[in-house]
Amino acid sequence: MPVITFDYDDLKELGIDIDREKLLDVLPMMGSDIEDFDDESIKVEFFPNRPDLLSVEGVARSLRGFLGIEKGMPSYDVHDSGVEVTVDESVLDVRPYLGMAVIEDVQFTDKKLKQVMEFQEDLHWVIGRDRRKVAIGIHDLDRVEPPFLYSGVEPEGVTFTPLDSVCEMTPHEILEEHPKGVSYAHLLRDHDRYPLITDKNGDVLSMPPIINGELTKLTVNTRRILVDVTGTDDRAVRQTLNIICTSFAEAGGRIGSVRVKRPDGELHLPDLTPREMRVSVSEASRITGLELSADEVMDLLMKARMDARRTSDDEVVAVIPAYRVDILHEVDLVENIAVQHCIGRIEPELPDIATIAEEDTWSRADASIREVMVGLGFQEVMSLMLTSEESHYRRMRLEEDERVEVAQPISQDRTMIRKSLLNGLLEFFEDNKHEDLPQKIFEVGDVVYINPESETRSRVVTKLACAVTHSSAGFTEIKSLAAAVVENLGYEFRIEPLEHPSFIEGRCAAIESEGKSSAIGGFFGEVHPEVVTNFNLEYPVIALEIEFK
């Protein structure tokens, strides 16, 4: 999770005069962990659902509410900067969305510049999915001349000096030779045009999402900055821009809007229009265990730096500031109410319910499945439900499709919820290549599919998967294992030929069966040699996956 470091003096400059001991007590109550501290500074880890707390300005803003210094939604004036930027159609297939804003009257020190860079990189991880979804550029506005153009250029179409370099390079050379270009080349390599932001004179500000130009590098003398946010998700782009702008405004900066001319219309950004959400007083009381009135709910929401108004004795409308991108549901408001009341003051209680315990039906079935697999000589493994598109799709030779993505991943290896167990088993083989053969492993676990009709827009399915690797693993062996598994579970089954990208053509089969109370379906076969190679394995692999419907 993201960790930020700031001095106690930083908080004092932002209106928080608090002794160290009290600060160490208060911060965990706001949803953070204290990583380290000394006489001058503190290192704090915040949960990734609160990207607005990834800067010391955001922390101070929240602290002022928690401590009762200020209540209600902060007000930010946004004036028209007169700056325009045009989004050219040539960039729509690469990185179509752009947000831009001007911040004036900024004051930088060497320490502040470092904090800004750390803030930027934390947002790249938490919202930007390591720049794939969102990338940020911050520039010295006085070094360039508007209006600006966001367009796609050919790999050898222009030269400019990238940040912290002395030589001009083409976009292609940056991807091949510059350290940042090499690290993020995969984001652009499949495209024949690369995004570029240029000014009126053709000078290059940035090559999103790779690197800024040296021309607009921030210094302690910078007084006006231009913030650009590009990405593949318009909502995430606007949210990121709002968080950055309001953070600078907390430090005394003045926000100027930019006219963004897109092919589908014009808009002025940032848009700091708040949104409203209703919360039930009785529901908040039930969830928290507190006896709350509408007035108390309003007061607690205002401590959370929102505005609130009562519409009835049992309903309050919360007015949510644009930088609070974590508020998605009524229960999020209830969480904020509990935090502002101080979670540590809420007494835990045992539920006043008398029941006779009984083992869940699926738990009994789950135990039977494991017993069958162990009896067949398999060893159980447990992998994480979170995986990545690289492992789940590309290494398995699968086309990407609808999936549940992690909105604010803390690692590029954990960006989605799995839809299959097989790649996890192959990763286990990859990590245990040094062990003796044969290796026979299985896993029983949940996967998640998109389901627009459900309340959560998702559907949880339990699957069984097993895999075997040794020098002579083949279709006959996995067919026998599939039959043994299904028969021991009490099903009659039928087998039909199946083509599956992860398996060798002609050596994969679908399995369908009907039981007394449920149905199962799945497939098995010899894993494709390309998949075996993708996981750096040296011997054939056979695998089975069954879904319990």
From Swiss-Prot:
Mg(2+) binds at residues 326, 332, 335-336. The keyword Oxidoreductase does not apply. The keyword Coiled coil does not apply. GO terms for molecular function: ATP binding; magnesium ion binding; phenylalanine-tRNA ligase activity; RNA binding. InterPro entries: aa-tRNA-synth_II/BPL/LPL, B3/B4_tRNA-bd, DNA-bd_dom_put_sf, Phe-tRNA-ligase_IIc_bsu, Phe-tRNA-synth_IIc_bsu_arc_euk, Phe-tRNA_synthase-like_B3/B4, Phe_tRNA_ligase_beta2_arc, PheRS_beta_core. Its EC number is 6.1.1.20. Residues 272-348 form the B5 domain. Gene3D superfamilies: 3.30.56.10, Bira Bifunctional Protein, Domain 2, Phenylalanyl-trna Synthetase, Chain B, domain 3. It is found in: Cytoplasm. GO terms for biological process: phenylalanyl-tRNA aminoacylation. Its main location: cytoplasm. GO terms for cellular component: phenylalanine-tRNA ligase complex. It catalyses: tRNA(Phe) + L-phenylalanine + ATP = L-phenylalanyl-tRNA(Phe) + AMP + diphosphate + H(+). Its cofactor is Mg(2+). It comes from the Archaea. Keywords: Aminoacyl-tRNA synthetase, ATP-binding, Cytoplasm, Ligase, Magnesium, Metal-binding, Nucleotide-binding, Protein biosynthesis. It is an enzyme of class 6 (ligase). It holds the Pfam family B3_4. Tetramer of two alpha and two beta subunits. Belongs to the phenylalanyl-tRNA synthetase beta subunit family. Type 2 subfamily. HAMAP family: Phe_tRNA_synth_beta2. This is Phenylalanine--tRNA ligase beta subunit. It comes from Methanothermobacter thermautotrophicus (strain ATCC 29096 / DSM 1053 / JCM 10044 / NBRC 100330 / Delta H).
